[in-house]
Amino acid sequence: MTIRSVEELEDLLSTPSPALIEEMAQLKGDILILGVGGKMGPSLAKLAIRAIREAGVDKKVTGVSRFSEPGLKGELEGYGVETISIDLLNDEELQTLPEVENVIYMAGKKFGTTGQEHSTWAMNTYLPGRVGEKFKNSRIVVFSSGNIYPFMPIGSGGADENVAPDPKGEYAQSCLGRERIFQYASHKYRTPLLIYRLNYAVDLRYGNLLEIAQMVNEGREIDLTSGHMNVIWQGDANEIALRSLSICDHPAKILNVTGPETISIRWVAEEFGKLLDKNPRFVNEEASDALLNNAGQCHRLFGYPRVTLREMIEMTAHWVAIGGESLNKPTHFQTRSGKF
């Protein structure tokens, strides 16, 4: 599979599976996406619109954001997504949002946390309390992070949902705070809810694979200390988020979302080296542990991701070779301190 343009990439990301189309046909009510302006939100909204259209049902998708990125609001509206431009932390504005049956909560702050901890905690932990109360009668899929888990031994298969959280650093702590506050709302109001613990969605414009490919292509050193990772194609991650609306429950269900492999960064870099005709440069040796998730429960519910690791590697190498667009949003996936 080769992607030659942003338009082809957006088309791939927004192509629904037959299973998603069927579930959108059965799902009752409209969909509200809070925090639609991030890396994943626009393609999730477009995926929802396409699935609804192909299902032949009448359902609105509304995206909520400050829309600070020029052109995004108009782009989404042109696709059929209704938009509402507000600051979610402004409670008066939050209360003006329409009541809907289905909410996908994507709002959050990660990068720039160090030195702005108060802002991160407000967005990641205070706001969920206000949202949980406002939408207590809705189904809610809450985007969270695999960062809430402890580092796991490389041979462990990663942390599954039964592993106790042990967040490192204030970002991860605030993410666990978000989960706990939404769980409180679920208990208090009997709100059906799913906590969606994602680690490392990628498309060709951002993510771990792009960063490794760029380092190989540019001859930069690759630090192998955090030498293993998980990834999942953003289109698959978005599809799982939408399909998770149908399994929200009380008390809140927890679901790890990532690909099936524990991936060696050394191996990935060497594969990029072959495809880009470059010799990867490595420093340090692999630690015995890393931030790894086990998404076996997710795969049992929804099947394996449609886009494979090998396809992601080949598409990313081609994208880098042709000088494809980058969002210039580093993931800092090699960070072990928990500081972002």
Pin down the residues of each PLM region.
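Amphipathic terminal alpha-helices
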Residues: 2-24, 309-340
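Conserved Rossmann-fold NAD(P)-dependent oxidoreductase catalytic core, especially the SDR/UDP-sugar
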Residues: 30, 102-105, 110, 126-170
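N-terminal Rossmann NAD(P)H-binding glycine-rich loop of SDR-like oxidoreductase domains
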Residues: 30-50
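NAD(P)H-binding glycine-rich loop region in Rossmannoid oxidoreductase-like domains
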Residues: 42, 67-71, 75-123
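Conserved glycine-rich Rossmann-like NAD(P)H-binding loop of the short-chain dehydrogenase/reductase
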Residues: 53-71
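Short-chain dehydrogenase/reductase
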Residues: 121-125, 157-179, 202, 230-231, ...
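NAD(P)-dependent short-chain dehydrogenase/reductase
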Residues: 176-230, 234-236, 272
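Mid/C-terminal beta-alpha module of Rossmann-like enzyme folds, strongest
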Residues: 240-297, 337-338
